[in-house]
């Protein structure tokens, strides 16, 4: 994997150069990035199913599994809310949108219309919960709906526990099948440099560096805030839990580079599951926390939502009282739960938030369209680190973390002596 790390880094640099020098060629490279992500997504659902179902069957204690789920949701809610608050506070202090003086009437609302339409197709809480239940067993896999696959996996695991010896045989088959899919992943990951090259070439070629210059204050504020969140907040949580955030970042550096190139944290989901298990976290915990975190624990997306909303209010001279900002925080706590780890999901979630908060003109989204792709990379990186830390923390709370193995792995030593 060390060679992959270097190759992806070189590919990202080459993608930036091609996109900047030959924009049309850069845009034409988009299928390379899309193809790589599709290959990864091809095996995500079966990997989650086999890992979670097999893990529950091996655990044998349904109460323990429920306990892990409750602890994970508590962690997600606390840290996600903290990320939203930090974005709100930074937006108030730095005021990256001050001085733009943009008249919403002069904006082309049609530019963001597609995102708004997707956001307005959101569902109520009851419909959302019902949507977690797939129409058919195969349908969840065909649609790639990770939460539906997770529901099926949990039911399958519980069924195995109740079936005694036969259930153990099924669990063994699931474990062996997961090895097959991880083998496929190891083959696909070799294509990561090509995918990163194509995706980065498209990003620079399509949107150019001009967008970064025009909205540099917002982009810089978001990147610095996210970096501080990772180092201070997640770093503090990691320290309390007995490991170094810096060593953890070094451990997942290959995955971070792939995410940087593809702007999608979902593109490394299977690899992260494998690495966290290798670091000493119990398989059943990894299988539950990581997939669930991709909908309920997107720290980077949460920071972006409140920070970007305040930026738009400031840029369009829309005053917001403290009460309105607190209302915005409450709405964001709900809409952020519908996000996912795919490229562009954060922008759609932002559109959903603005659709519910009438104070800020929704046409203001057009301001961010050109620069959102660059911010998507930072969102994805922060989301990835956040879910990785969450998994290790929940595993430690549950007594499902091999501390000695984790220390060895983060030091760069073999997992077993």
Swiss-Prot record:
HAMAP family: C4_dicarb_transport. The chain crosses the membrane at residues 8-28, 36-56, 70-90, 137-157, 180-200, 226-246, 285-305, 351-371. Pfam families: SDF (PF00375). Signal peptide: none annotated. Gene3D superfamilies: Sodium:dicarboxylate symporter. It is a multi-pass membrane protein. The keyword Cell membrane applies. It is found in: Cell inner membrane. One of its GO terms (biological process) is L-aspartate transmembrane transport. Belongs to the dicarboxylate/amino acid:cation symporter (DAACS) (TC 2.A.23) family. Keywords: Cell inner membrane, Cell membrane, Membrane, Symport, Transmembrane, Transmembrane helix, Transport. Its main location: membrane. One of its GO terms (molecular function) is succinate transmembrane transporter activity. Responsible for the transport of dicarboxylates such as succinate, fumarate, and malate from the periplasm across the membrane. The keyword Nucleus does not apply. This is C4-dicarboxylate transport protein. It comes from the Bacteria. One of its GO terms (cellular component) is plasma membrane.
């Amino acid at each position: 994997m060390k060679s992959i790390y270097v190759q992806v880094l070189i590919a990202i640099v080459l993608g930036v150069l091609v996109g900047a020098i030959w924009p049309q060629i850069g845009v034409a490279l988009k299928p390379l990035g899309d193809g790589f992500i599709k290959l990864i997504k091809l095996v995500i659902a079966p990997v989650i199913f086999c890992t979670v179902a097999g893990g529950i069957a091996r655990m044998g204690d349904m109460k323990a599994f429920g306990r892990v789920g409750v602890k994970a949701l508590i962690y997600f809610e606390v840290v996600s809310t903290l990320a939203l608050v930090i974005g709100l506070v930074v937006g108030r202090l730095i005021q990256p949108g001050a001085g733009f003086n943009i008249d919403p009437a002069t904006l082309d609302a049609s530019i963001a219309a597609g995102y708004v339409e997707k956001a307005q197709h959101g569902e109520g809480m009851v419909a959302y919960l019902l949507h977690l239940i797939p129409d058919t067993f195969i349908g969840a896999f065909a649609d790639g709906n990770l939460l539906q696959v997770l529901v099926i996996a949990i039911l399958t695991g519980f069924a195995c526990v109740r079936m005694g010896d036969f259930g153990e045989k099924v669990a063994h088959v699931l474990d062996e099948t997961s090895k097959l899919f991880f083998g496929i992943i190891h083959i696909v990951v070799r294509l990561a440099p090509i995918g990163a090259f194509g995706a980065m070439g498209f990003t620079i070629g399509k949107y150019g560096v001009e967008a970064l210059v025009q909205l540099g204050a917002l982009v810089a504020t978001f990147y610095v805030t996210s970096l501080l969140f990772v180092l201070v907040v997640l770093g503090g949580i990691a320290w309390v839990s007995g490991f170094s955030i810096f060593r953890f970042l070094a451990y997942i550096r290959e995955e971070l580079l792939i995410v940087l190139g593809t702007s999608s944290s979902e593109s490394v989901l299977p690899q992260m599951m494998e690495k966290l298990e290798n670091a000493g976290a119990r398989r059943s915990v990894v299988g539950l926390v990581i997939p669930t975190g991709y909908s309920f624990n997107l720290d980077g997306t949460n920071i972006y939502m409140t920070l970007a909303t305040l930026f738009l209010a400031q840029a369009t001279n829309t005053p917001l009282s403290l009460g309105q900002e607190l209302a915005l925080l409450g709405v964001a706590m709900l809409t952020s739960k519908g996000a996912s780890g795919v490229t562009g999901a954060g922008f759609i979630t932002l559109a959903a938030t603005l659709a519910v908060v009438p104070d800020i003109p929704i046409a203001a989204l057009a301001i961010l369209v050109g620069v959102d792709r660059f911010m998507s990379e930072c969102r994805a990186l922060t989301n990835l680190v956040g879910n990785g830390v969450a998994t290790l923390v929940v595993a430690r709370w549950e007594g499902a973390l091999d501390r000695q193995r984790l220390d060895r792995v983060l030091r760069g030593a073999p997992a077993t002596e």
